Amino acid sequence: MRLLILVIVLIDFCYLSAQEFTLPEDTEVWNPVPKIVDTFDNLAPSDAIILFDKDSLNNWQKINGNPADWEVNSNIFTIKPGTGDILTKQKFSNVQFHIEWRAPRLSGESGQNRGNSGIFFQERYELQILDSYNNKTYTNGQAGSIYKQFVPLVNASREPYVWQNYDVIFIAPTFNDNGSINTRANMTVFHNGILVQYKVILEGATTYIGKPKYDFHNNGSILLQDHGSKISFRNIWVREIEVP
């Protein structure tokens, strides 16, 4: 008898559940309404912050706060070796980031000495720039790697002096009130349109020697590294994004 009652109750429950959604409109969501972002071929989207477009490094500065003094010419700018890193004046958290870069032709150079630079998100987490076209080096230090942490899924590098691009989703770490890590940073990277990193969970800030680790920090700038190579850049933009 108890079993019969249970079966009847279950049948009634399933019937009532089925009656909850009887029209297509019952499962339609109308709010919130996503904001409109205009998009264009080979141009930044309408809500992007333009970090470099044509002929000015006004959005950048040196680490000591002095004006960025890399060479600007014909809508591109090029590292002036020995002058030091530059970083954005604005600080960021989670971002979608686009950059185009070009390695010089360097005869006789190989490994890490061939077209080396890097993009440091929040001044700490490095996406490596390197001429990795027919250039052997440690694989967690080639183009598309999260330096000394994650090897790229593939090598999508083009020949030297051919323009390349990165499209990056960087999700910043969060910290507890006592400064300890709450959620670690993660990064997704497309190199020349090819997925090379997918939601990799960063082990900490980039280090050349030793293991990476997290130390408390707030939002930070995007830094471009002077590693002694005349890497050129153009069409740099960023979108601030919110994540649940």
Functional labels for PLM-detected ranges:
Residues 1-19:
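Bacterial Sec-dependent N-terminal signal peptides
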Residues 18-244:
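Carbohydrate-interacting regions of secretory-pathway proteins
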